[in-house]
Amino acid sequence: MKINKFLQLIFKKLVQGIFKLFYGKISILSDSKILYKKHYIEFIRLDNNTKLSVKKNVHQISNARIYTDTVEHVAIIKNNLIIPKISYQQIHGELKGIEFNKVLISGTPRIIKKFDGRVLSLVQGASAHNYFHFLFDILAKLILCEEKIHLSEIDYFYVHKK
């Protein structure tokens, strides 16, 4: 049993190393570099007479990539720099700083799929495994996005497979 685990670990590290050679090492974006647009949303309209204060941002990033392990980590990466405050890491139920994001250690060990057009990322933590979180997270993101970018302008909606 221990030999199997050891061989799995060796294989995993080998695959991660190969992908790091292809895609490069990921670093943390410093605050001095701006690689994206930030759209501030103060409120959303619920109907003609009602507004709800939200005070959130929608981030627009050109030519970036998204990596997720579908549970704890979502990394938004541009030019091999992970973007803090947009990327997400929740480890054992606790939100952590960007320095804990998995891609900084293991890279992005998946084949990159390219999409021509606008992609709205709807991935986040438990939404892949929990129907309530899926609806709660997705609907909120769609409503926020609609305030700045009409959903008909989105070519792809990136959600978890499950």
Regions found by a protein language model. Name each.
Residues Y158-K162:
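Catalytic donor nucleotide-activated moiety binding site of glycosyltransferases and closely related
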